Amino acid sequence: MDFFGPHLLAYFIATLHFLGTLAAIHAVLTVRTAQGSIAWALSLMFMPYLTLIPYLIFGRSTFDAYIQARRQANQEMHTAITALNWRPWVEEALAARNSSAYASLRAMPKLGRMPCLANNEVHLLINGDATFSAIFEAIRNARTAVLFQFFIIHDDELGRQLHALLKEKSAEGVAIYVLYDRIGSHALPHRYVQSLRDAGVQVKAFATRSGWLNRFQVNFRNHRKIVVVDGITGFVGGHNVGDEYLGKKPPLAPWRDTHVQVTGPVVACLQESFAEDWFWAARELPPLILPDAYPEDGVLCQLLASGPADPYETCSLFFVEAIHAATERVWITSPYFIPDEAVFAALRLAVLRGVDVRLLLPSRPDHRIVYAASSLYAIEAVRAGVRVFRYTPGFLHQKVVLVDSEISAIGSANMDNRSFRLNFEVMLLTVDEAFAKEVEHMLLDDFALAHEVSQEESRETRRLQQLGMRVARLISPIL
């Protein structure tokens, strides 16, 4: 006992460094990006007492067993869906190929593994009041089934309105399916969920895998926000269910976000995306509904659902393809700006082509380390010729892309490593000049409420502040 006493701390530190070395080797072998591998390996080698536990939580970005299990579940889901003769979009897909605008999206159907579909109708929903008024109205009018998926559901005023409405519709005989992310909705009380289940609502939490350790796994989160009512009306965008998304909670209020409402053949793609996630959580299919007929005209839409089990880094490639497609302008709004090398290079090249490249970012942080890393990338973007704007009234959370005069995309994907490689995301692309004009007007209103970062400001950043930003950027691949 006398021998171990003085040396116990030394043994403990040596053990931590040994485990850190093993974890560093694991990071080099498994983390998807070189930047992420280097960041994890160095921190695990030299500071294992600070980074070993976070690595177990954040670092397993290519957990092969999970990815294989998810792919197997997707295959089983598609086998089950084939038995339902789920062929909703043949005529609409052919119509899309005959469209002159189809060429601008030629890579997207292969990238997203879903067809580009014609004859859709889309409506822009600006901010929380418009979004949840439209969603709740659609649910009130539901007759058959409601598919409801959000990253975050809070037990607050808005969450309780949703709770009461879902119970009411379930009592009327409508099939209600609710899917929320276990980490994103970690504060949702059990009584909230159990009350819905007691009322006949099907509720599942999206989790990576079972097991004690995976309760702390914050990678592979389901960040999608999807609502489908009766297989006819769909919603997708950036909002979650909570009072802060209505701009009711300082210091981030007023909250700026965007959703889109859609009808037409692309709603079938929304249902299929929901079905994949529901099948993973429940090992059964939700009701999938096709309307008797679709409109004979409308706009071109492409759903892009991305996730860590994809054969490609779908979300990152989406941004690269959208930026490369621009000949006149590409305007992007995101709460976080931590691009990978491919996306940042695409932005640089767009500037060199003479494209009007603009980024709209928040002026206040919700996560300080992420904001610091984002700020350094924003400074570098300004120096590369990108026009960077900071939205000043409140927190900007919308995820919108506008390319030239026809192409727009609205959904859940941020411009950061987590959306690019670790989370499940969904974006709705629309090819239509009139809708793009609506998005343009919305963004022009946002730019009018924003402060443009000048070249001089980017040079005036204090050295200590720059040091903090660079440290934050160093760990940005693992944020």
Curated annotation (Swiss-Prot):
Annotated PLD phosphodiesterase domain residues: 218-245, 392-419
Family matches, as InterPro entries: Cardiolipin_synthase, CL_synthase_A, CLS_N, PLD-like_dom, PLipase_D/transphosphatidylase
Main location: membrane
CDD domains named among the record's database cross-references: PLDc_PaCLS_like_1
Keyword Calcium on entry: no
GO biological process: one example: cardiolipin biosynthetic process
GO cellular component: a single term: plasma membrane
Keywords in alphabetical order: Cell inner membrane, Cell membrane, Lipid biosynthesis, Lipid metabolism, Membrane, Phospholipid biosynthesis, Phospholipid metabolism, Repeat, Transferase, Transmembrane, Transmembrane helix
Transmembrane stretches, start-end: 8-28, 38-58
UniProt subcellular location: Cell inner membrane
Keyword Glycoprotein: no
Single GO term (MF): cardiolipin synthase activity
Pfam families xref list: PLDc_2, PLDc_N
Recorded topology in the membrane: Multi-pass membrane protein
The protein's Enzyme Commission number: 2.7.8.-
Active site positions: 223, 225, 230, 397, 399, 404
Reaction equation(s) it catalyzes: 2 a 1,2-diacyl-sn-glycero-3-phospho-(1'-sn-glycerol) = a cardiolipin + glycerol
PROSITE patterns from the UniProt entry: PLD
Similarity comment: family membership: Belongs to the phospholipase D family. Cardiolipin synthase subfamily. ClsA sub-subfamily.
Function: Catalyzes the reversible phosphatidyl group transfer from one phosphatidylglycerol molecule to another to form cardiolipin (CL) (diphosphatidylglycerol) and glycerol.
Protein name (record): Cardiolipin synthase A
